[in-house]
Design a protein with these regions (language model features):
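Conserved C-terminal structural/oligomerization subdomain of aldehyde/semialdehyde dehydrogenase
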Residues: 9, 62-216
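Short beta-strand to alpha-helix junction loop
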Residues: 23-34
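Short secondary-structure junctions
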Residues: 44-57
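Helical element adjacent to the flavin cofactor pocket in flavoenzyme catalytic cores
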Residues: 35-44
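Short linear capping/connector segments at secondary-structure termini
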Residues: 15-21
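Generic structural signal for helix capping and beta-alpha/helix-loop junctions
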Residues: 15, 56-57, 131, 152
Length: 216
């Protein structure tokens, strides 16, 4: 994993097709990301890789282009993250990974569900039983088994739970439910006023009892 991180190619994707990611969307998002990196470090996490914003004086070997043309960020990896740390419970929007060690499967599932967010989840394993245990126990709107969220599955509902998303499931056939409501219509064609189901005064109990007696 660290080898992949260290060899990540960063730059302007409009000029270079093989870069993994480009600059931050805006200066405000760049500042928010740098603030979150500081939160990781003050929480006590161990930084394995990353040097904040990419500059001409501080840039990865595989950076291509002019660092002054955008808010480019190093990829960051933080280890030794625990459940009591602030960075464990926050969404960091940018190239950063926080690594949490789990004791076993149950503990890993607990850690995943301890997040206040639940948009997407993923489980990588060769054990199908473990994968389906994860699928049944995870509190998230989407789950990938040996696959990450692609965001382009038009036939599947998209949405999250807890603090993620607005709860709707837009995409697939479920989009009809998201943007419509049920309307019940009873069209009487006999020309007679029909009794409602709760109008029981006209029910002939004696005849009903006789019918049941005949069946007996």
């Amino acid at each position: 994993f660290m080898t992949k991180v260290e060899s990540t190619k960063i730059g302007d994707s409009m000029r270079h097709d093989d870069v993994l990611y480009g600059p931050m969307l805006s200066e405000r998002y760049a500042k928010d990301f740098l603030r979150d990196l500081g939160m990781c470090e003050t929480s006590g996490a161990t930084k394995l890789w990353g040097e904040g914003m990419i500059t001409d004086d501080s840039k990865p070997t595989n950076f291509v282009g002019d660092a002054s043309e955008g808010a480019y960020m190093w990829p960051h990896v933080y280890a030794d993250v625990t459940e009591d740390m602030e960075c464990f419970h926050e969404e960091i929007f940018g190239p950063a990974v926080t690594v949490v060690k789990a004791k076993d499967f149950g503990h890993a599932l607990h850690l995943a569900n301890a997040s206040p967010y639940g948009l997407s989840s993923a489980c990588y394993t060769n054990d199908r039983l473990e994968a389906y245990r994860f699928k049944s126990g995870i509190k998230a709107g989407m789950t990938g088994i040996n696959n990450s969220t692609t965001g382009a599955e038009a036939h599947l509902p998209f949405g999250g739970v807890k603090g993620s998303g607005n709860g709707t499931r837009e995409s697939g056939i479920w989009v009809i439910e998201a943007y419509s409501y049920w309307h019940a219509v009873n069209d009487e064609l006999s020309g007679k006023l029909q009794l409602a189901q709760m109008d029981v005064d006209e029910v002939h109990i004696e005849e009903a009892d006789a019918d049941y007696a005949g069946l007996a």
